[in-house]
C-alpha cells in the first residue's frame, strides 16, 4: 500500500519566522517517523515531501508505505513540535486537518473490476486497472481518533479478498454479527464516563512504562478478585471444570501446530532466550554503566533466535497436553486455568483499560464428543449471561466474526470438521460511547471442531469423533464493563459485588500521585 497526504497542522496563532525555524528543525528529523520501523523498511515510513507556512497553518505534503503511515506520521509530529516551540514561543496546536488523503492498494485487474460500484462511508473509491484508490477529504482530529481511515481500508481489503473469503463466513450457519440474545438493565444507567478517564485520578491504576500495561492498585485488584470468584462460582464450578496450572511460555512448535503463526503472527510477543556466556554479558554491563544507557544493539547479539511466545490465547497448553495421545470420549476432559496473564501485541490498537496487551482471564478448555463439546460451550455462555443479569449489567451476545483458530485457515481443503457456529461473543454495553452502541467483549465461547485434533494428532481409541472447545472469561474486561455501567462509587454497586469486595482498601498515599 502507498499513502499520499495533503494536510495541515493548525496552530493557535500565526507562526512567526523564529517559530518557523524551530519547527523546521523538527520536520527535518526523520527519526520521528522511524520509531518501531523494522531495519531495512525505513523507506516504507512517512516522508515529508514538502511544507509551507501560511498564517496559522503548517501545510504538509507527506507520503509513506505501510510503516508509520502518513496519517500516523502527521499526528506523530504534534508532540515534538510542541516540545520545541510551545513554551518557548507561547504557541499551541489547535487541530490536525487532512485536506486530501489517497490510500492506494494494488490487485489483479480481475479483482479490481469486481469492486465497481463499491460504496464506502467517509471516502470515495476510485478504480484503475491494477489499483484501488481510497480517497479521504476534510478529515479532522476527531475522525483520526475514531480510526475511520483504518476501518475503511479494512473494509475495502475485505471486499477485495472475497474470492478468498474468510473461512468464518463459509462455515458459520448464522451470519457473523447476528445478535442471538440481549438484556436491558432494569435500573436507569446514569454513569456515562469512560472508566479509564477516572481510574488513574482515583488512584486505582497507574500507567506502566510498557505499552498497553497498567499497575492495578489495591482497590482495582480487590474488584478483579471479586469478579474472578464470582465467575468461578457462578460459571466454571457449575459446569465441573478442573483447575490446572497452564504454562505461559509457549514453544513456537506448539503455536505452529495450532496454526496461530499463519493466522496472527503479528499479534504475539516473541521470546528470545539469552546465550549462557557470562563474559559477553559483562561487556554489555560495562558499556551500559559507562554510557548510562541500555546498549540494545549489543544485547541483540547476546540473544538466541526466538523460541517461544508469551501465551496469546491461554488455551495452548491444553492441546499440547494431549499431543498424539489416545483419548476416550466417554471420559471427556474439562480443564480451566486462571494462573496468570495473557499477552497480545495490539500495537497501535492498545488503548485505555479495555484494549490492553496484558490481561487476566479465566480460561476453560474441554474435549469430547461433538455433542458434549457443544453442550459445554452453550453452558459456559448461559452462566455468563445469568451472572450479568444477576448484576443487572446490560449486555448482548452475538455470533463472532473472528474465531482465533480460523485465522490460519483462510482456505480449507483437508476435510476439517467445523461447528455450525464457531464463536459466540458476549459484550457488556459501554454507555460512554455516544456515536454508536458499542460493548466490550467479556466472554468468548468457541468450538474448534477437529481443528486442534488434527493439528496435534489426537485420536479416540475407538476412532470416534473428537472435538474441542474453549471459553475465555475476560476478567479485565468484565471489570471495565462493570465500571462503565456502575462507576466507582461503592454505594452504587449491586449487593452481590459489595459482599464479594467487602471493604475497599485505600489507595497508595503519595505526595505526587495520583
From Swiss-Prot:
Its cofactor is Zn(2+). Its main location: cytoplasm. It is found in: Cytoplasm. The keyword NADP does not apply. It comes from the Archaea. Zn(2+) binds at residues 315, 363, 470. One of its GO terms (molecular function) is zinc ion binding. Its EC number is 6.1.1.11. This is Type-2 serine--tRNA ligase. It comes from Methanococcus maripaludis (strain C7 / ATCC BAA-1331). The lineage of its organism: Archaea, Methanobacteriati, Methanobacteriota, Methanomada group, Methanococci. The gene is serS.
Amino acid at each position: 500500500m502507498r499513502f499520499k497526504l495533503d494536510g495541515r497542522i493548525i496552530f493557535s496563532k500565526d507562526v512567526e519566522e523564529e517559530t518557523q525555524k524551530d519547527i523546521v528543525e523538527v520536520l527535518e528529523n526523520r527519526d520521528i517517523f522511524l520509531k518501531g520501523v523494522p531495519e531495512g523498511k525505513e523507506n516504507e515510513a512517512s516522508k515529508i515531501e514538502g511544507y509551507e507556512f501560511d498564517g496559522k497553518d503548517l501545510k504538509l505534503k507527506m507520503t509513506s508505505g505501510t510503516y508509520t503511515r502518513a496519517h500516523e506520521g502527521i499526528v506523530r509530529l504534534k508532540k515534538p513540535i510542541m516540545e520545541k516551540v510551545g513554551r518557548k514561543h507561547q504557541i499551541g496546536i489547535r487541530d490536525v486537518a487532512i485536506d486530501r488523503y489517497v490510500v492506494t492498494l494494488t490487485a489483479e485487474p480481475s479483482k479490481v473490476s469486481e469492486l465497481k460500484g463499491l460504496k464506502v462511508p467517509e471516502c470515495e473509491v476510485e478504480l484503475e486497472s491494477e489499483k484501488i484508490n481510497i480517497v479521504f477529504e476534510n478529515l479532522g482530529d476527531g475522525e483520526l481518533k475514531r480510526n475511520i481511515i483504518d476501518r475503511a481500508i479494512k473494509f475495502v481489503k475485505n471486499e477485495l479478498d472475497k474470492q478468498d473469503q474468510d473461512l468464518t463466513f463459509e462455515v458459520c450457519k448464522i451470519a457473523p454479527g447476528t445478535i442471538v440474545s440481549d438484556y436491558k438493565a432494569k435500573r436507569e444507567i446514569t454513569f456515562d464516563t469512560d472508566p479509564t478517564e477516572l481510574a488513574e485520578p482515583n488512584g486505582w491504576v497507574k500507567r506502566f512504562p510498557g505499552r498497553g500495561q497498567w499497575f492495578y492498585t489495591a482497590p482495582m485488584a480487590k474488584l478483579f478478585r471479586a469478579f474472578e470468584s464470582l465467575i468461578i462460582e457462578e460459571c466454571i464450578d457449575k459446569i465441573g471444570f478442573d483447575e490446572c496450572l497452564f504454562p505461559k511460555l509457549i514453544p513456537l512448535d506448539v503455536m505452529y501446530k495450532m496454526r496461530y503463526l499463519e493466522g496472527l503472527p503479528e499479534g504475539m510477543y516473541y521470546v528470545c532466550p539469552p546465550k549462557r556466556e557470562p563474559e559477553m554479558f559483562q561487556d554489555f554491563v560495562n558499556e551500559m554503566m559507562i554510557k548510562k544507557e541500555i546498549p540494545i544493539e549489543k544485547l541483540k547479539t547476546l540473544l538466541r533466535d526466538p523460541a517461544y511466545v508469551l501465551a496469546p490465547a491461554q488455551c495452548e497448553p491444553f492441546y499440547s497436553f494431549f499431543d498424539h495421545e489416545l483419548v476416550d470420549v466417554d471420559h471427556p476432559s474439562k480443564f480451566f486455568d486462571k494462573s496468570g496473564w495473557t499477552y497480545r501485541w495490539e500495537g497501535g490498537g492498545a488503548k485505555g483499560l479495555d484494549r490492553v496487551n496484558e490481561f487476566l482471564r479465566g480460561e476453560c478448555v474441554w474435549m469430547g464428543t461433538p455433542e458434549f463439546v457443544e453442550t459445554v460451550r452453550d453452558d459456559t455462555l448461559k452462566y455468563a449471561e445469568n451472572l450479568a443479569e444477576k448484576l443487572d449489567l446490560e449486555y448482548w451476545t452475538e455470533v463472532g466474526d473472528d474465531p482465533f483458530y480460523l485465522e490460519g485457515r483462510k482456505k480449507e481443503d483437508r476435510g476439517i470438521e467445523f461447528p455450525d457456529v464457531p464463536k459466540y461473543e458476549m459484550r457488556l454495553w459501554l454507555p460512554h460511547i455516544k456515536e454508536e452502541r458499542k460493548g466490550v467483549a467479556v466472554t468468548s465461547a468457541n468450538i474448534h471442531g477437529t481443528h486442534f485434533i488434527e493439528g496435534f494428532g489426537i485420536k479416540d481409541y475407538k476412532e470416534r469423533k473428537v472435538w474441542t472447545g474453549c471459553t475465555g472469561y475476560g476478567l479485565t474486561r468484565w471489570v471495565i464493563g462493570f465500571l462503565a455501567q456502575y462507576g466507582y462509587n461503592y454505594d452504587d454497586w449491586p449487593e452481590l459485588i459489595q459482599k464479594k469486595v467487602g471493604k475497599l482498601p485505600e489507595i497508595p498515599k503519595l505526595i505526587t500521585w495520583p
